[in-house]
Every structure is written in C-alpha cells, then in structure tokens.
C-alpha cells in the first residue's frame, strides 16, 4: 500500500471521527443542533452576518441550540429567560470569557477587564467600578456637553455649504474624545482630524485592531490552521504594541503628576486604587475602555441618523417633542430634559434594538456541567454565545419596523403589577416566560448580570446629548434616495459608508 493511500485513509478516518463527534448526542438533555460538517462544524452557517443567521436558526432550533465553531462546542442563547438564568442567577458558572490566540494577543494574555478570568476579573471589575463611581458625574456630563457642542460646530459647515455630510469620522471623533477625556484627560483638538497629528499614533493601530478582531480568524477555532494566520496575528501583535506604547507614555505622565487628593480622570483613579502596582492592567483596561466606549457609540449615532433620515415623519415627531420641551430659543440640550423626551429616548432605544452594537456580545464559557431549569444540559467548557440582537428581534411584535412609539407605550403601560406577571408564550419556536414585548428585558444592548457593560450610564448620556443636539440644530435627509440599512458585521456592527444632507433649523 502506497504512502499516499495510507494518508488518504487516515484523512478519511479523521474526518469520519470528527463528523461523528460533532453530531453525537452526549445526553438525552442535549439541545437541538443542525447537522455539523467535519473541521468547520457549523461555521459555514454563519455567513457574512452571523447575528442574522443565528437569529433565523433560533426560529428553527429554539432559544438554546448547539453549534460547533470549528473545534469548540458552543451554545447560542436567543431566549431572554435562559440568558437571565445563566448570566444573572448562575453567573458564577458563566462569568469567564472564552479565550483564543487573537484574544490573548489583544489582551496582553488576559490582563485586561474584557477577557480576564476568575479572581483576576473580579479584582479588575472592582477597580474599574470604583474608579467610575468616584469619577464625578457632573464633570463627566460637562465633558460630554462640551464635545457635543464641538460636534455641532463641525457640522455647521455642511449645513451652510450644502455639501453632503459623511458622519463616520465626525461621530468617531466625538465618542473618542469623550472616552479619552474621561479616561486620561486627552482630546483631539477641534480642528484636528482623527487620522492626523500625534493622536493618530493611537487611533490608526486601534482601528486596525478592531478590523482584525472583527474579521474573524479560523485559526482561533481550528487549531491546525493556526500557521496560516501567522501574519495576521503578527499584525495584530504589532498594532496592540503600538497602542500599548502610546498609552504607556500617558500612564508614565500620570504617575509623574499624580495628586492622590485630586484625581483627574479614570486612569488616575485606577493608579490610586492599585497602588501604582498594576501598570499592565491599567493600560489594557484603558484600551478596553476605548474599544467599548467609542466604536459602539459612534456606530449607534450613525444608525440613529440613518433611521431618522429614512423616516422623516419620525424625525419630525421627535423634533416637535424636543422643541415643545426645550423651547425654540434653546441653544443646547442638556441631560435635565431627558425624562421629558420619551419619544426621542424611544428613538435612541429603538436604534439600539434594531442595530445592537455588539450583537453577539463576547463569548463566555461554562465552568462546570450545568442543567437549566428547562432541562437543557450544558457541558463543562461549552462556549456560550448570547444572541442579543436575536432576542431583541424574536420577542417583539413587528421587529423589522423602526417604531420609537413602542417604547413610549411600553413605559406608559408599565406598572409594578404587570412587572410581576408571567406568561408563557411560544413564538417562532422559542418559549418565554417574559411578557411579550417586555422591552427592558428583551432589548439588552449592554448585556445583563455582573459582567455587563460597566460604562452603560456614560453611554446613555453620550447618546442622548449627541442625538438631541443634532436634532435641535439640523434637519437631515437622505437626499431623496433611501440610505442602505444593511449592516457590516464586526465586533460592532456598522453601516456602509453613507452621507446625509443637513439643513440648519430656523
């Protein structure tokens, strides 16, 4: 028998073994799963928009189903009750993140807050929560209001000239400045571009990291393909090093000028709380803060403008509500008006539902074998993929329609009595005990449980001040041609490049 034939038989045997392993039930309580193929498992089903593909699969296979991501057994959660059971009631078994070669490179071998595990994560979360709490809220609001004013000023030119306004770089600068101001007292000046000047040493490699992590890496899921991704990982390593070096200089400045009685920003707070002994952690947490706080909010602002430009009647209604609250002579909207603008707030929340910034969040791992209250068995080591986008789609009426009024009606009708009620409904083959259209429980842009987004309050202020002041100052339109609402998948989902026409409000 020739060596070639032996290799062929071995290959066929390995493929047969892999096929059997990935399709064999390990208990009678296994969730459903589609047929897996050797090597890839179910990766071929993800397509270019995995969040949409998984949402459709949930309608067929249920609110929890198994998928093999290459070598990794995974379970996709598209049921708010199951997600709450795992992430809230049993969070100690599900708070660790999944790791991979790409993640280890980005996180400095898991020393950040996004991907650290076990006691390390608990310590980092405690430091960050304390630092955010001690960062004075009024100071934060003042910083955001200032940046919102800079944003409006930068948009005025396009309203006067009639030139198309491409919002991407302006919204990114707005959100990046907020994060850098709060994080380490740095900003991009009003006349400086994101891609130019000293700050570009941070921004350009930072965006490269986002693109690298968002594009996926087969080597993270099929171990023997890792050599083919050597150069991609090397590029990620180089960009991560550039970001680290830039932030290290800022860290050293903070150490040199530290006044423990008067901390200036989040980095000062972290240095004080760690006694200046956790340099790597502080720098990598700062990188996380940039990632979570800038890109997600910038993309949400873009989607907000797209939906209101494509739905001028909704824009008109939101503007009329805003003017009725702040008055026509108002120069700048502040946070004090937020509670009096339910329709505008509903438009922002509906944007987060329709285009959840991180639709599949970050993958976690089951620390031990676990049986859900519904009798589904989750083996130790299983990856948990929370389909936040799918939950916000499959548990509301008319999910593909942009309806801010659903939020207005929801909060108007929400009472403590209704909050305590529980019904069981089967919708799209997904069983839920949560009330139909219980929006606060099925729209989860910041995730849930102890490992949710620690900066969600800052994010909400950020979005309200930007959206309200843009609406106050400009009527924006799609120029008579509907803007493409198809998203581009990544760590955060973005719209395709687009422009809007701005008209100064009278």
UniProtKB/Swiss-Prot annotation:
It comes from Dictyostelium discoideum. Its cofactor is heme. It comes from the Eukaryota. InterPro entries: Cyt_P450, Cyt_P450_CS, Cyt_P450_E_grp-I, Cyt_P450_sf. It is a single-pass membrane protein. Its EC number is 1.14.-.-. This is Probable cytochrome P450 519E1. GO terms for biological process: response to imidacloprid. Its main location: membrane.
